[in-house]
């Protein structure tokens, strides 16, 4: 059994443990994923591969991650499309921006993408989002069309705490988001 653990407690301009793609960058202790313009894509990836699947045994590892984020938009009605925490092959490249959140190119299921994402979706896309039109947190498997969603009441400018956990024995991925203040 192998354990991988790391902690990124501060961001800075010389961030060695992250790979930035597209518009992603760090400055002033902040990670910024996109510019304030339409259809941009920015990503930050951990620089060392993390093995969660053993190709010899087929076993999948449990994992837990936690992070804090703030969406600080000029107004609470126009906050772009959102962002994702995702797990993908190490050679993954940025995909289509906008509603595809830089992770997918199509709403159709694609088993070759080998991607699992938790989306924090702030914009209703009629082609694949839940019909209620709410902002939501979704679990995506090889497609931007979520296999499970829960409505999310975004608190613009407020710090949110997230915990994402996968239990390999039950094959269940859970997501928790709280606003501490």
UniProtKB/Swiss-Prot annotation:
Binding site for Ca(2+): 121, 123, 125, 129
Taxonomic superkingdom: Eukaryota
InterPro entries recorded: ConA-like_dom_sf (IPR013320), Lectin_legB_Mn/Ca_BS (IPR019825), Legume_lectin_dom (IPR001220), Leguminous_Lectin (IPR050258)
Annotated keywords: Calcium, Lectin, Manganese, Mannose-binding, Metal-binding
Molecular function GO terms recorded: D-mannose binding; metal ion binding
UniProt xrefs under Gene3D superfamilies: 2.60.120.200
Pfam families according to UniProt: Lectin_legB
Signal peptide interval: none
Residues the entry annotates as binding Mn(2+): 119, 121, 129, 136
Family: Belongs to the leguminous lectin family.
Miscellaneous notes: Binds one manganese (or another transition metal) ion and one calcium ion. The metal ions are essential for the saccharide-binding and cell-agglutinating activities.
Record note on quaternary structure: Tetramer of two alpha and two beta chains.
Protein's UniProt name: Lectin beta-1 and beta-2 chains
The organism's taxonomic lineage, starting at the top: Eukaryota, Viridiplantae, Streptophyta, Embryophyta, Tracheophyta
């Amino acid at each position: 059994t192998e354990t991988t653990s790391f902690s990124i407690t501060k961001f800075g301009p010389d961030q060695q443990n992250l790979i930035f793609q597209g518009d992603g960058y760090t400055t002033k202790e902040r990670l910024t994923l996109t510019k304030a313009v339409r259809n941009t894509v920015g990503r930050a990836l951990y620089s060392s591969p993390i093995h969660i699947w053993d190709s010899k045994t087929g076993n999948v590892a449990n994992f837990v991650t936690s992070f804090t984020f703030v969406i600080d938009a000029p107004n609470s009605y126009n906050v772009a499309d959102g962002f994702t925490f995702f797990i993908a092959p190490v050679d993954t490249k940025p995909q289509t921006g906008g509603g595809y959140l830089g992770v997918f190119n199509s709403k159709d299921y694609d088993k070759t993408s080998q991607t699992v994402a938790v989306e924090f979706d702030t914009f209703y896309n009629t082609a694949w989002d839940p019909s209620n039109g709410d902002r939501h947190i979704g679990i995506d498997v090889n497609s931007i069309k979520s296999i499970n969603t829960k409505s999310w009441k975004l608190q613009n400018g407020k710090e949110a705490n997230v915990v994402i956990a996968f239990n390999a024995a039950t094959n269940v991925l859970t997501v928790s988001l709280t606003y501490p203040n």
